[in-house]
Regions:
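Small-residue-rich hydrophobic transmembrane alpha-helices
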Residues: 47-100, 144-153, 268-317
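Interfacial/gating helices of multi-pass transporter permease domains
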Residues: 11, 37-60, 122-128, 190-191, ...
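Alpha-helical transmembrane segments of multi-pass membrane proteins
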Residues: 108, 121-147, 275-279, 318
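Membrane-interface helix-loop junctions in multi-pass transport and translocation proteins
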Residues: 169-205, 318
């Protein structure tokens, strides 16, 4: 019992609580979007939005290969401002470049992919338009995630909380003006979700980049950018990405495609949002806590593991 108690005391429970609040914010505006789509006329809104589920699985493969290793590499460079600044600049170029290439590929082959995934012919055209808009939003999204990792690495955790709440507020406002059926809304339907994501992700990314610039991490200097660290980055990322590739591709073919075959993509999308947004929130945020703690202190693996298992057990019991 003493070992468990000591391990729990070593876990940053305050940060875990903050992560829960951070995770709750996107869950709230996702739930609001489900409500707005439910108010739209016709039966296809959920089905069209549901097509993004398997598209996000493709992006998740790249995300886990990029974002997860970043916690380690950004954390390890924090003591050297020049090294951190170089990794920040080159990391933005690499992650943005990879996502841009992937998005271009998805935009070009959206309709063949929808046909392969057995989407209903009645919604292929509308779904293709929505997926293309979201593909642009995903590029802005990965850049936002990257700079948020940078804020955590330099110890500006409170700003991350602020921007998470701001994202919730901005999404509610833009969704209301773009998606809702209110008199002043543009009534863009499902496509409004994609436009909302582009607007919010872009604005927040620009603001955070300005903050990092004022902190002295994005100043222009004569020092040549070095991509040498990317060799180790890609080695670690490839392992994480390979595991995610096998898992997500199998899920796409065995679950997502089957859902389209039986014509229940809309129901699946709503249920999936509830499960991942509400039921699994504590477990997902615990994972974020572990990544942050281990990236800054490798000894946390030894001292906190028992505490992590205890928290997980408590969550499962609840």
């Amino acid at each position: 019992m003493n070992k468990i108690k000591n391990s729990l005391q070593s876990v940053n429970l305050k940060f875990f609580a903050a992560l829960l609040v951070m995770g709750l914010c996107p869950t709230i505006y996702t739930t609001l979007r489900v409500f707005f789509l439910g108010q739209l006329p016709g039966d296809w809104a959920y089905s069209i939005a549901g097509q993004l589920s398997w598209v996000n699985l493709i992006y998740e493969i790249i995300s886990e290969a990029i974002i997860l290793p970043l916690f380690f590499f950004m954390g390890s460079a924090i003591l050297n401002k020049d090294d951190f600044s170089n990794k920040l600049k080159t990391g933005l170029i690499v992650s943005g470049g990879i996502y841009t290439i992937l998005s271009i590929g998805i935009i070009l082959f959206t309709e063949p992919l929808l046909t392969f995934m057995a989407a209903s012919p009645d919604i292929i055209k509308e779904s293709a338009t929505y997926i293309r808009i979201e593909s642009v939003a995903n590029v802005a999204g990965v850049l936002l995630n990257f700079v948020l990792v940078a804020l955590i690495a330099i110890g500006r955790d409170k700003l991350v909380y602020v921007f998470t709440v701001l994202k919730l507020a901005f999404c509610v406002v833009t969704d209301t003006f773009l998606i809702s059926t209110l008199p002043f809304s543009l009534n863009l339907g499902v496509n409004g979700i994609g436009y909302s994501n582009i607007i919010v992700n872009t604005i927040l990314t620009i603001v955070i980049l300005m903050i990092l610039s004022k902190e002295g991490y994005l100043v222009r200097d004569k020092q040549k950018l070095s991509f040498a660290w990317c060799k180790d980055f890609f080695k670690i990322g490839s392992v994480s990405g390979l595991e995610s590739f096998v898992r997500n591709i199998a899920y796409m073919l065995m679950v997502s495609r089957m859902v389209n075959v039986v014509g229940e993509s809309g129901v699946y999308w709503v249920a999936n949002n509830f499960i991942w947004g509400w039921m699994l929130l504590p477990v997902l945020q615990l994972g974020e806590l572990i990544k942050q703690e281990v990236s800054t202190d490798k000894n946390k693996v030894k001292t906190n593991t028992l505490g992590y298992f205890t928290i997980t057990t408590f969550i499962c019991i609840l």
